Structure formats: C-alpha cells, structure tokens
C-alpha cells in the first residue's frame, strides 16, 4: 500500500553492491528501514544527495507488513539547498545528532510530537546564523523531554549538586558518586534555560562546552541502556576548538 509521509534521514548503510539500507524517522510510521536503489546514470532510483544525515524528505512509500525493509517510490527534498552540507559546523552537528538519534530512537510507531520537534530542530539548524556551537547542547536538553529523562530544574538552588542518576539537584552529595559538583551543577541548571531562540546568548569556552557535553552524554548513558560511545563526537569537539 502506498503512503505519503515526511521523514528525517538518520543513517545510511551499504547493502551489497547495488543497494542502501536507510533508517528514516517518519511522521506516519516512526523509525523505518528502507531498502533503496541509488540513482545511477540512466537508471531510476533515489539520489544519494537526498540521503545526507538529517535530510528532510517528502516521501511516497510502499509499506507491507510481511517485510522488514520497506520501499520508497518517490523522494523529494524538503531541506534548504546545501544548508547543512556546505557549512562545516552545521555538517558536524548533523553528523553527531543523527548518530545519537539513530541510537536512541527505536520505536516503530508514529510519535507526532517527537517528529515535529525533530523536524523543527533541523529547520533551526539550517537557518541559524549565530550560536551554532551551542546547537547540539540545546538539542540534547530538549530531546531529553521527549525521551522521558528530562533533568528536573525546579529542584535547583545555588550550591546544590546535580544527581546524574536521579536527574535532580540535591543538598547532600549523592553517595553513589554519579553527580556534578556545585560549579558544574550551576552550569547544568543554566543550560536547562537554553532554547534554539536564545542559544546565541550563552557564551562558553571550548573547555566548558566540551565538559558540559561530556556531562550530558553521561546523563544519557545512565538513563538509556545501551547508549554507545559516539564515533562523531571527536569530530564535533575538534571543530569547535
């Protein structure tokens, strides 16, 4: 049966000599694996330029319940032309965040609020002209809400410690040792106020931003079983040195 849906490219993997398996987060079906024949000279197929990380697509897809990999009949770009691919910082952000999404989104059911958040976030990245170095931090904090692991900022008071296991700020040092000190906790509380609209107003040194990202990834790792080491992390960190 044919369906029309929007989608966001998460990951592309070669399959044999002629095919690609592409993980796409779709508006109608959640995460779906598609078996794709790349377009070649004189032959129909999906242009590989459409399959870059976090590409936004308008799709006509064929779904059948008796197969694990579905098919794309037509694909049209909804992304702004070359907005991510030609900008080194935005390209690094897209690689990093698409890797995270590929690892944490497993649902094969539609989740409209999550899809709309992701679609709008990619649009913000495409059009941003300031604060790009803070985009991934903003994104990860906002994504945590949809994953059900949002840090509880309401518990913050100056001098408290952020408990990475419980996701709250506490007066006492947690005995389990998974916590941030008072200075780190102050920064964590500050970051919970950051949005795509105001991210350019938050100034951090490379060292601070790298440390903050490490804490956020530790938080994800503690709350999302199987969260892996990320191949694109060092590329992102090196770019913003």
Label each residue range with its predicted role.
Residues 1-241:
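Non-catalytic alpha-helical scaffolds and adjoining flexible linkers that form interface surfaces
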């Amino acid at each position: 049966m044919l369906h029309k849906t929007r989608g966001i490219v998460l990951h592309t993997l070669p399959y044999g000599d002629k095919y690609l398996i592409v993980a796409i987060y779709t508006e109608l079906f959640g995460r779906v694996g598609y078996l794709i024949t790349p377009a070649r000279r004189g032959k129909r197929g999906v242009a590989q330029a459409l399959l870059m990380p976090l590409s936004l697509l308008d799709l006509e897809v064929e779904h059948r319940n008796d197969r694990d990999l579905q098919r794309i009949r037509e694909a049209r770009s909804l992304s702004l032309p070359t907005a991510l691919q030609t900008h080194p910082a935005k390209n690094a952000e897209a690689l990093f965040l698409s890797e995270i999404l590929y690892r944490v989104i497993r649902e094969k059911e539609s989740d409209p609020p999550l899809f709309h958040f992701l679609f709008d976030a990619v649009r913000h990245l495409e059009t941003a002209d300031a604060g790009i170095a803070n985009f991934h931090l903003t994104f990860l904090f906002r994504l945590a809400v949809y994953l059900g692991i949002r840090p509880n900022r309401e518990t913050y008071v100056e001098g408290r410690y952020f408990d990475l296991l419980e996701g709250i700020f506490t007066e006492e040092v947690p005995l389990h040792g998974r916590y941030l000190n008072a200075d780190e906790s102050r920064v964590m509380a500050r970051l919970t106020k950051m949005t795509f609209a105001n991210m350019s107003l938050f100034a951090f040194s490379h060292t601070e931003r790298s440390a903050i990202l490490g804490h956020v990834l530790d938080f994800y790792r503690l709350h999302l079983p199987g969260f892996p080491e990320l191949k694109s992390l060092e590329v992102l960190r090196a770019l913003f040195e």
